[in-house]
Amino acid sequence: MSIKISLKNNINDKLVKNYVLFCDENFKISGFNNLYLKKSSSEIQNMVNLNKNIKKEFLLFNINSSQKIILIKVRKNYSSAENEKLGASFYKFVKSNFVFKFTIFDQNVKEFFSKNKLFLDEFIHGMKLKSYSFDKYKSKKDNDIFEIDIFNKDKFLNFGKNKRFEALIEGINLTKDLVSEPGNI
């Protein structure tokens, strides 16, 4: 599976299929008042209250017949390794729920992660690490593509500017390919 990331300056909220929102331990969504979703805040809060007691990192529910919300519970003071693990478990969650396209909003990320500017890079780095699969010798290859749209209206997010994460992904995937390759006997 591959992950395609697009930075968008302008987005039509009605065309967004799946919203990904980060929230605290109590599922309080930061930056919610700046989003298009604030119109349906009472329904969203009711769904959160119904599922609040469940010890899950992610909540998925429908807003209407064509749109879903995925809430990601993030604890304060996460280290970069924990952010990567959260991204990896999020990848596993969306893959198991067949959610292949979703949108992340900078207003949500900006208010929630003002201390760690690299949070989104670390989170998506974990997703990319988890998405690796060795299918060189498979006859039926998995061609699913995860599409992530990052709405960056205020140019707050410097996503992708740090090439360290891309270099790590390439090196780790090459190493995994070499380890998975059968030996020459």
Model-inferred region functions:
Residues 1-185:
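Short amphipathic alpha-helical segment within the helicase RecA-like ATPase core
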